[in-house]
Amino acid sequence: MKLKTFLIVGCLGGLFTLSSCTAPTNVKDYSVYVNPFIGTGGHGHTFPGAVVPHGMIQPSPDTRIDGWDACSGYYYADSTINGFSHTHVSGTGCCDYGDVLLMPTVGKQQYRTTDPQSQRLAYASSFSHKNEIAEPGYYSVFLDTYQVKAEISSTKRGAIHRYTFPENTESGFIIDLDYSLQRQTNSEMEIEVISDTEICGHKKTTYWAFDQYINFYAKFSKPFSYTLVTDSITMDNGKRLPVCKALLHFNTNKDEQVLVKVGVSAVDIAGARKNVESEIPGWDFEKVRKDARTAWNEYLSKIDITTSDKEDKAIFYTSLYHTGISPNLFTDADGRYLGMDLEVHQGDTLNPIYTVFSLWDTFRALHPLMTIIDPDLNNHFINSLIKKHQEGGIYPMWDLASNYTGTMIGYHAVPVIVDAYMKGYRNFDAKEAYKACLRAAEYDTTGIKCPDLVLPHLMPKAKYYKNAIGYIPCDRENESVAKALEYAYDDWCISIFAEAMSDFESKAKYERFAKAYEFYFDKSIRFMRGLDSKGEWRTPFNPRASTHRSDDYCEGTAWQWTWFVPHDVEGLVNLMGGEDAFVQKLDSLFSADSSLEGETTSSDISGLIGQYAHGNEPSHHVIHLYNYVNRPWRTQELVDSVYRSQYANSIDGLSGNEDCGQMSAWYILNSMGFYQVCPSKPVYSIGRPAFDKAVINLPEGKTFSIVVKNNGKKNKYIESVSLNGKALNIPFFNHQDIVNGGTMEIKMTDHPTKWGVLSPALSSKKEE
């Protein structure tokens, strides 16, 4: 049948009053250092909206609909706002969400977009960045087209909007349920008016998350008349068209404020209503804003830095802010949540479930950072992953809205769990976690509750080849080298977990798998290289060649992937021909031609220093490899170079996708002076601290301080290090040193030194 438009008009009555705000408290305000606009330009893909740490709801302005730079809905170069939707992902390279769009209007409401490919909706408004404010837990902008000031704040499960209108007899709102980022397919959709101040609805979308369910409940402080519109879905004969938009109408006086409260839930509308009513019972916008700021200050205060450089302070606390956006809470206020089996489960709000696990990115630094600043929260993340295995049949690779997406490679829930376990954080069922680790490493397509299109990505044949013949042939499996290297690392993690579980047979098996990286190293050229099913090297070979997601590597080149053996650096050094040969090759990485070759090179290969690509995750540990081969001064000067070239207090201040906190976590750890090269091995590599002092406020009132003497822009080299008053002569220390509390003192100088260089007799013990 042809597309039709249906209008339903009604008028209702009622009114709510506003309460006063509460008085501020006297605490150190770290939030003033945060610039949420960092990463909203370039390809950082962050958003400036009003969120609280790891909250369920992310109200934020949407300035464009589709394309790579619409992943978060907001792009700083844009000059129009389509509205304020309530779900967003931060810093990702894949796109989804943008649900439940709300937009204030003044005048006759336009809702039919003449150009279906336009990035601008019919009711969009122009705006100026000079009239835009973003801070932790608060966002404000003046909508020029309607002369309306928009303000947003949020709690964990609810959002509150405040709009200041001009005098007009045609003021109102548009709630657009049909809208979503990337123009997703809506297989279910409905809006219902409950009263003259309440609207609810639900929809199911199919996109990156194959079966995403979203329910909403909205409460308005001012009564409205309404028009319900359906204009976007053609249904079979005999079925009514679902309502996709609500046009709300009312009169406003000059500077009249109208407030809106919105709750969302993946479970049902009742859950969405309870979420917002339990957390925002009244209409006190300023209280919600203040509480959101307090929540962020509690999170940001976990690390206190001392520096005279305001730009560096903004970068640091914005980085810490970005690590607090996801994973996102997914348990409703009544304890219910949608599981990986897409069934509703009754859970516990004290042990909530989370979603948005970008594990290919975040196992590297985000989760190791969490073991330092909030191990209890990290345990909640781990318990969520275990639940996802139990409900869906396997650990997720990239979980979005309780959907297996199959995005990226590896089984990196494993290092997240094993890293916590090896650091002594074990508030989870270790036996169940271990069983799930073994399941993730084996090729078995049975019992996994995911769409057929996702299954080959979630359970690739690469696992079969790894286990059956010992390596992954490049003529049988895409991205064979990258998968093999990450599997070898994940399998090493399983081997040490097996030992802890007294499963010595599995320990031996996975230790053997952990050495599989050796198959791919071509000693004649000293690169990791594709090996086909006949045992022959991939030819032709070009270490700068890239075909995005369709070659032997994953979002990278042979230059970037050759170094991914974090669990056995000594073994990689030996393959290279010893320390001197390894250093020569590593130096070449940073001086190589930065150009890429190929018709469809990967846009993710960014932030290049030579062929080192800081804008994507496979390179993130590489600089610290110099510490393993007696060249610690190279680690120090290159970390300093990354600070200066890859991070800035600007809209394009990130060299690549922020990736759900990973790019930021790298900066946080390194700027304090250390980095964990191999998650699951609780050892930190010392680099170049950026600040005069950093104090980590640990649980139970302890602190670990890094005090830097003679610090400065030119003084990027370490002269000496002491830990709790004792000289530390190796460029490594243990996680337990942080947990115990204490002080590390680092003295800097302006020239390379021999600090951290070990004699041959001590070299093999450098990480002990």
Question: Residue ranges of each PLM-predicted region?
Answer:
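N-terminal secretory signal peptides that target proteins for export/translocation
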Residues: 1-2
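Sec-dependent N-terminal signal peptides
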Residues: 5-14
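C-terminal motif of bacterial Sec signal peptides marking the signal peptidase cleavage site
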Residues: 18-20
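Accessory carbohydrate-recognition regions in carbohydrate-active enzymes
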Residues: 23-367, 371-415, 421-485, 493-519, ...
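ATP-dependent phospho-/nucleotidyl transfer catalytic cores
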Residues: 490
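Extracellular attachment/recognition segments
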Residues: 717
